[in-house]
Amino acid sequence: MTAATRQEVLCLYRSIFRLARKWQAASGQMEDTIEEKQYILKEARTLFQKNKNLTDPELIKQCIVECTARIEIGLHYQIPYPRPIHLPPMGLTARRGRGLQTQEKLRKLSKPVYLKSHDEVS
């Protein structure tokens, strides 16, 4: 990891913690605010710990883009949770033979940038 990339990652990490400190739930209730703040901090710690050993500059850049997108989406919609994608598991047209592999490939390609670190299939 280059010094500039390290600086950018640390800046994002600090900005997430500042965001969590100032976060207000859209409902305005204190319980929701506390729960959402805890979620933001837990999610940030988990994902940064998961990706701390990455060495490929391209993967690091993708994680930075994902982090930035999640921050922007969270601020815009006032929801700290990732927005779901609405593609049913077998929602694409079925084909014979390699059709299932094609569906899996299309499903991976259709996954938004802000959900790349989540492993579950929506």
Swiss-Prot record:
Annotated GO CC locations: midbody; mitochondrion; nucleoplasm
Highest taxon in the source lineage: Eukaryota
Annotated signal peptide: none
Family annotation (InterPro entries): Complex1_LYR_dom, Complex1_LYR_LYRM1, LYRM1
Family: Belongs to the complex I LYR family.
Listed PANTHER family: LYR MOTIF-CONTAINING PROTEIN 1
Function: May promote cell proliferation and inhibition of apoptosis of preadipocytes.
Protein name, UniProt field: LYR motif-containing protein 1
Record organism: Mus musculus
Gene: Lyrm1
